[in-house]
Amino acid sequence: MAELLIKSVGETDPNYGCNPNERPIKEHISNGVVNLDKPIGPTSHEVDAWMKRLLHVEKTGHGGTLDPKVSGVLPIGINRSTRVIQMLLGAPKEYVCLMRLHEKISETRIRDILQEFTGKIFQTPPIKSAVKRELRVRTIYNVDLLEIDGQDVLFRINCEGGTYIRKYCHDIGEALGIGAHMAELRRTKSGPFTEDETLKTLQDLTDAYYYLTQENNEKPIRECILPMEAAVKHLKKIVVRDSAVDSICHGADLASNGILELSPDIKLGETVRVLTIKGELVGAGETVENSDGILKSNKGIMVNIKKVFMEPETYPKMWK
């Protein structure tokens, strides 16, 4: 992680807010996200509903739907965090795909076509998709060929959110003139969530909830449910003064004098996360200056706040 640029120095009042990892357990669950390893079989919405019943919460929601036959990383938000999870919809994704060619061809042709289908591509969503079927541009960041076994081609693909891998395989088959289809698919990354130690199964969550409710052991559930802040770790950040927090929670944009620290290399118009000194997520917005401009500014709005995630009055009102 790049070292933050210091614009100003400030202190935080320990009487307000808290470190995201130290929230009381009820608040931790209600503001939490789960990096779930979705199994093959249920729909993403069925998994949401199952988690809602298990945890006895009001609301659950996922970021980036996986089809029933697809497994892997499915981030799920709980209660207030369902709004944070929506920030993942456009985030980069990674998949491991098994594509089945309808005829056997040379490895050279396979490598060439994967190279051809890297960069900007055109896609029309499949007939069964939940979105309007319009031609759209998607970016394929890179494709790694992992293995070829006869007509089966295993590859890893990093792509823009909203890319349809099933359609990607179909279009490759069309371009080759032999036909192809997606045989198996697993998502290995969604924004900041990967197949690391935070990835948990439905059984892990069931066991953790048992330990919490029957043995008063919080540790397993805290390992399964992450603070909402985990869902936006892929975004660059701006740290603000305590005095700026409540005004943002009431709809104000972020002014220059409220900023303490910021990530380097922030671009004009980039979506950033806005955090307290303690590391709590206040909201997210679009910058009106780059890092250098923000650092040198003495006045004016620096971030147009688009989403607020923190409850008002978590920090004291210091604005008029």
Protein language model features and the residues they cover:
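Short, structured patches in soluble enzyme cores that scaffold and shape functional sites
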Residues: R80, M99-E103, D144-E147, I157-G161, ...
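Residue-level signal for inorganic ion chemistry
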Residues: I76, C97, Y168, I248, ...
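The conserved catalytic core of RNA pseudouridine synthases
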Residues: V131-G162, R166-L176
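Short, glycine/charge-rich beta-strand/loop segments that flank catalytic centers
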Residues: G64-V73, P92-E94, P126-R133
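Accessory RNA 3′-end/elbow-binding domains used by RNA modification enzymes
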Residues: M1-H62, A130-L135, D152, A175, ...
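Short, intrinsically disordered, mixed-charge
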Residues: K52-V57, G90, Q115-K120, H170-I178
